[in-house]
């Protein structure tokens, strides 16, 4: 099965093709607020790198949020359209779970603005603490491998390769049964995105 994986939820554009437990081709770039401009160009590039036809994919996997208001919607809109038109399977994974890379005892932190962060804690991909929005002062990273925007809480910023993370977290992909009902997991009210 050839799966197109996409993440545009935060400041990265990650596109990869995974087949039989291997990455066939991948593009991982930081391009905050430019994903919508770059995604189709990079999709063409991805399929050229892989020497595969776009019609060869059997499924699509995307991050479902949290993330930037527009960012989460970019990959989701593309994936829903492809899956619906081509009758493909569609899978989702939490952005924070993906960014944990399936590693042990990992706290993922992503800037949510206004002195807050999206935080999720995972152990080998399993949820220890559900994804939530927290005030920066309330986050205690002690005893955790901190991934993401660690500098928000006095740690180093650290990020795994997102395309590789899709592969390492495959067991946690959730199949979408009703594409029409798939909506982003924002975790905060829409008006707070403008702060």
Report the location of each language-model feature:
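DPxDG-like acidic metal-binding loop motif
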Residues: 59-90, 95
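Oxyanion-binding and handling regions
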Residues: 1-22, 34, 91-195
